[in-house]
Amino acid sequence: MSEGTNTVVRDVTIVGSGVAGLSAAVYAARADLEPLVLEGPEPGGQLTLTTDVENYLGFPEGVGGMELIQRGKEQAERFGADFRHGTVEDAALEDRPFELELADGDVVRTRALIVATGASARWVGADGEDELMGYGVSTCATCDGAFHRGDDVLVIGGGDSAMEEALFLAKFADSVTVVHRRDELRASDIMAERARDHERISFRWNAELLEIHGSREEGVTGATLVSHPDGHPTEKLDASAAPRAANGIVEETVDVGGIFYGVGHVPNTEFLEGTGVELADSGHLETLEGMTTETAIEGVFGAGDVMDPDYRQAVTSAGTGSMAALDAEAWLESQSVRSGSRALVGPTAQS
């Protein structure tokens, strides 16, 4: 990977520019580490898909997701963080300084690495989801559920994530309909029982979301569902040239005010596979036990949703971002390899 490598060696490079990455950038920049932030394929991360954030400390009237991200970037830049468009495709972490190969072929060298690449919510591929994501279509009930007080809403999925979404939404919505493509849930028994026993939650079995209706001005106004007695109706829809009704497929349009995807998240850790960084079965970055963001490789730290399969909140991502920066600063001090006010010593000083 070293061919064509940039000779500059950064103290800290942060991969990802969501809340976790920005928080890490602010803290690292204030520590005079002059961090480089590689923004990734979706600058700003998942929060840019949220129109209103009402549960982030310090904004009693709420704040737009994009505005919160932009403010965070400006704050980090004010303290000296350097932002660059770029996506990491490969990482060499066996030697120091670490090397990160970008999609454009350039290579970034860094002494410490903070991975804040987030986790991308799975979408279902329904017509209209691209236009209406963030405008009534959501992947986070905790973030957006309160906006649907009094609405009828759909939850797509059949696992624990979907049950958690449905149970949270039932606090606000008049009705919650769980749409699942099979006739039994994949969720744990206890989560399935809680959802089944809730008076506001009902189920549409052997059904899938085909199309979402509405506009960015009005939000979601309805949805087209397809169902089949044997389940997985869209597969049969794609495979059959016959009329839908003749193939046993039933199509129905329902009026709803919101649609929530509960089909899981995929951590953005592909570039770490085979590097020695430990990944959970789910793909999430594994950190060491205890209150730390350190990983199995010294000098590599994790922050945000990429290492958090449970909370997935903007405020917790900001917290782990600051922790990662503080951990990275302490580690660099212990190695005496900061390129700022401290003299470089040790084998990496000549890198």
What are the functions of these language-model segments?
Residues 83-103, 107-143:
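Glycine/small-residue-rich loop that forms an oxyanion/phosphate-binding "nest" at active or ligand-binding sites
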Residues 18-19, 42, 119-121, 160-161, ...:
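Residue-level detector of alpha-helix initiation sites
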Residues 2-3, 7-9, 125, 131-147, ...:
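FAD-site-proximal beta/loop scaffold in flavoenzymes
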Residues 9-11, 85-86, 149-151, 206, ...:
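Phosphate-coordination loops involved in phosphoryl transfer and adenosine-cofactor binding
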Residues 76-95, 99-102, 107-110, 171-289, ...:
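A Rossmann-like FAD-binding core segment of flavoenzymes
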Residues 163-165, 297, 306-351:
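A conserved FAD-binding loop/helix module that cradles the flavin
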Residues 3-6, 10-79, 151, 163-189, ...:
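Beta1-alpha1 glycine-rich phosphate/pyrophosphate-binding loop at the start
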